[in-house]
C-alpha cells in the first residue's frame, strides 16, 4: 500500500471514529444532525466544508480533506434513492470515499465506482437496531 493510499485510509478511519462517538437525541431535524456531525468532526480537529457542490444539481452535505464526502439522512432513507445519490457523488472526481450517516439502518454497497462506501447508523450507536 503506498503512502497516499495509507493516508487516505487513515483519514477515513479518523473520520469514522469521530462519527461513531455521536449520540444523537431522537427526533432531530436533518440540519440538527448536520450540526452534530460537524461538532463531532470539529472536536476531533477534522475540518470539513458544508453543502459542497460537486456538479450541477449535485451537492454533498460535508466534504473533508482527502475527498471524503459525508451524506447525512434523517429517518429511514429510501434505499434506491440513496444508492442513486451516492452513485452520483462517487462519479465526481473530488470524491475518494463516501460515508453515509443515517438514523436508521440502510443497506448500501461497499463500493460504488471503485470508491469505498461506509455507513454509520446513529441508532445502532445507542444499541438500537431499527
Regions found by a protein language model. Give the residues of each.
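Short, charged, amphipathic alpha-helix that recurs within catalytic cores of restriction-modification
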Residues: 75, 80-112
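Conserved catalytic cores of phosphodiester-cleaving nucleases, focusing on short active-site segments
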Residues: 62-76, 89
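Acidic-basic catalytic patches of nuclease active cores, encompassing PD-(D/E)XK
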Residues: 2-53
Amino acid at each position: 500500500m503506498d503512502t497516499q493510499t495509507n493516508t487516505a485510509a487513515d483519514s477515513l478511519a479518523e473520520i469514522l471514529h469521530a462519527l461513531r462517538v455521536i449520540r444523537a437525541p431522537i427526533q432531530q431535524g436533518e440540519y440538527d444532525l448536520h450540526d452534530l456531525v460537524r461538532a463531532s468532526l470539529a472536536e476531533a480537529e477534522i475540518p470539513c466544508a458544508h453543502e459542497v457542490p460537486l456538479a450541477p444539481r449535485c451537492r454533498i452535505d460535508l466534504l473533508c480533506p482527502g475527498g471524503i464526502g459525508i451524506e447525512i439522512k434523517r429517518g429511514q432513507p429510501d434505499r434506491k434513492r440513496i444508492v442513486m445519490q451516492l452513485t452520483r457523488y462517487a462519479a465526481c472526481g473530488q470524491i475518494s470515499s463516501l460515508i453515509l450517516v443515517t438514523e436508521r439502518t440502510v443497506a448500501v454497497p461497499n463500493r460504488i465506482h471503485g470508491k469505498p462506501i461506509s455507513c454509520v447508523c446513529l441508532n445502532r450507536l445507542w444499541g438500537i437496531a431499527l
